[in-house]
Amino acid sequence: MVTAQDTLIVSDSSMKNIITYSADERIYNDVAKKQVHLFGNAKVQMEGLEITAGYILLDLEANEIWAQYRYDKDSLKVEYPVFTDGGETVTCHRLKFNTKTKKGFLEELSIKQDEFYFHMETAKRQTNEEIHLLKGRLTTCDLEEPHYHFQLSKAVIVPNKRIVSGPMNLWVKGIPTPLGLPFSYIPNQEKKTSGLLFPA
């Protein structure tokens, strides 16, 4: 067991890179299972990626990272996982990431792109770094329960290029409207014109 605030560095032979991890409260190294458990403000960094969460499990045998929130003394959920990949930051409830394939799976996530907020049920990070989103909401309202949103079935984020969504319907104050679109396109570049581009 490693005390809080210690940082360990381990070489992932399959990836030939360095994984750095730390935690504020406790680090437990299960040598037999080749697993490391990180408790309290846990952090993992590797090759341009960073994951922080209340609890993180490193499975060195399976080349996987698992992360989720933790409960505080009042039984409230705190320290939700935050996945940062280059300029993209995603907050979620739970995530799994494979350090070998670079694929990831996230549950109950939120993504902010300029003035747009995505609140989705699930997402998959592909090997090419695209993020595929399934079932959720798109809005420019920053409230937890937005005054209005577009209900989405799916969307794809291509880093530094674009965001494309499938069919979506407008909801206002929790009530669906007859307004809908077959798809939408959002530029996602450092130098871009802000705003949704709708089909003609």
Model segments located where?
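Structural signature for solvent-exposed beta-strand/loop edge elements and short helix-capping sites
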Residues: V2-A200
